Amino acid sequence: MPKHSKRYLEARKFVDRTKYYDLDEAIELVKKTATAKFDETIELHIQTGIDYRKPEQHIRGTVVLPHGTGKEVRVLVFAKGEAAKEALEAGADYVGAEDLVEKIEKEGFLDFDVAIATPDMMRVIGRLGKILGPRGLMPSPKSGTVTQEVAEAVKEFKKGRIEVRTDKTGNIHIPVGKRSFDNEKLKENIISAVRQIMQMKPAGVKGQFIKKAVLSSTMGPGIKLNLQSLLKE
């Protein structure tokens, strides 16, 4: 059983673990229990009803939060020529082709949060799959990170577009803001994220798609959300 810090145990006293909280109350509580000295990230954890044994039910896509995540997103783009120029002008942090592939392979360079590639670059970066894949950084058409429209993709990821995927237990974890966000912005981000996840329901999933939702801060306890009221928002 993992040992929790004194701060965590103190914060947990405020949370009734048998209760399912309405969203407004949960937001108040998650901010109250985020007591670390840094600006903690507020995270939404969604348990889905997918069968992970069936690859066609795996979820991978992107969610655009109206107020972003509060985190500065470092974007790397694999592109050449005009596309490379457009990516730089759109605000990409790193742009290159074979040179970036080599930097990642030989130097272990991973100082970025999102990797985008033009379709013609996939042949070049294919060998990075073993490095970027396990870290969720490998460009993919499903996540909108393989595209000819690199400038648009860079701008969206910089603004708050985030990649989401189900883990091996069928859960999705989404950063929805920072403790410093006002309550209304957090609420709008959470509602928007849930609506977008609902639209990703695989055709083969039977029964309830979203089975449970929990809100927490980086270092704080989980706060269970009242699904009925959340899905009505």
Swiss-Prot record:
The keyword tRNA-binding applies. Keywords: Repressor, Ribonucleoprotein, Ribosomal protein, RNA-binding, rRNA-binding, Translation regulation, tRNA-binding. One of its GO terms (cellular component) is large ribosomal subunit. The keyword tRNA-binding applies. One of its GO terms (biological process) is regulation of translation. Disulfide bonds: none annotated. Gene3D superfamilies: 3.30.190.20, 3.40.50.790. GO terms for molecular function: rRNA binding; structural constituent of ribosome; tRNA binding. InterPro entries: Ribosom_uL1_bac-type, Ribosomal_uL1, Ribosomal_uL1-like, Ribosomal_uL1/biogenesis, Ribosomal_uL1_3-a/b-sand, Ribosomal_uL1_CS. SUPFAM superfamilies: Ribosomal protein L1. Binds directly to 23S rRNA. The L1 stalk is quite mobile in the ribosome, and is involved in E site tRNA release. Protein L1 is also a translational repressor protein, it controls the translation of the L11 operon by binding to its mRNA. Belongs to the universal ribosomal protein uL1 family. Part of the 50S ribosomal subunit. This is Large ribosomal subunit protein uL1. The gene is rplA.
